[in-house]
Amino acid sequence: MSSQFEQLKLLSVLVCDTGDPELVKTSGSQDATTNPSLILKVAQEPKYQELLTEAIAWGIRQNGDDIQTLTFVLDKIQVNFGLEILKCIPGRVSLEIDARLSFNTEAMIQRAIFLSELFAATGGDKKRLLVKIPGTWEGIRAVEVLEKQGIACNVTLIFNLIQAIAAAKANATLISPFVGRIYDWWIAAYGDEGYSIDADPGVASVSNIYTYYKKFDIPTQIMAASFRSKEQVLALAGCDLLTVSPKLLDELKKDQSPVAKKLDVAAAKKLDVQPVELTESVFRFLMNEDAMATEKLAEGIRIFSGDTQILEAAVTEFIKQIAAQDA
């Protein structure tokens, strides 16, 4: 019997969720995802010093003011790590725009365009890049514009069906529903109810989104994310993509138990599901009705924003050191 990892690869595209190119290289995954939180963990490691210092030097050469220089450097760090990751996989990498722009449609559009153009100018193939945009109403409006311009988007921080429907209406290439964070909220709110894996709130949320998309032939891909256990991953076998931490990927490689397909297009099409008529007011009302989605979306933005600020502080110190050496 082959490993669960190998069995799962026959049912879903496996994606490695890390900022560490070396871990991506050994993961055996097709694609990779990263974010400021993950890059922050590895950006200052000695083995990646060159990626960091090159980004800082490039940013300084753009001759912007202090704020512009910091923006240039942060995006170049992402691009450098993204390109290094792409050397290790055959597929795509997802890079994220600044979470502090989450409620400014035009700013997100401009930042995504800049990131995409910088990626291409540094030698990247735009077809292998997904730009991560938060699943706010404003973010989804940005996605609608960007997709028309040929910039493939990964709508992240998806916590319920209405966000998924809105992203699909905007023709997003891909969405990332967060299984583990949904589960975390339910456990924090109601305690450990001893959920069976099939009743896991995070698993159920992704299953509902999958059913809706497949029922109505929606081409937007679903990449389930933020897993807390191997069991959650296996419970979504058959989902378009699964982005999994290196730790859980290793657990899957060590286990040879059989893997069953849990999500199936034909089965989804047989279910009685009604289409949702989407407007901004419907989106905002249904988000307001969903305490979990509202709270976890806000929390996710705060976490990514906070990690970006920590990364900024570290980069600022590096810039000061370089300036002092040149003085």
Curated annotation (Swiss-Prot):
GO terms for molecular function: transaldolase activity. Keywords: Cytoplasm, Pentose shunt, Schiff base, Transferase. It is found in: Cytoplasm. It is an enzyme of class 2 (transferase). GO terms for cellular component: cytoplasm. Its main location: cytoplasm. It catalyses: D-sedoheptulose 7-phosphate + D-glyceraldehyde 3-phosphate = D-erythrose 4-phosphate + beta-D-fructose 6-phosphate. CDD domains: Transaldolase_TalAB. One of its GO terms (biological process) is carbohydrate metabolic process. It holds the Pfam family TAL_FSA. Belongs to the transaldolase family. Type 1 subfamily. Homodimer. NCBIfam families: talAB. This is Transaldolase. The lineage of its organism: Bacteria, Pseudomonadati, Chlamydiota, Chlamydiia, Chlamydiales.
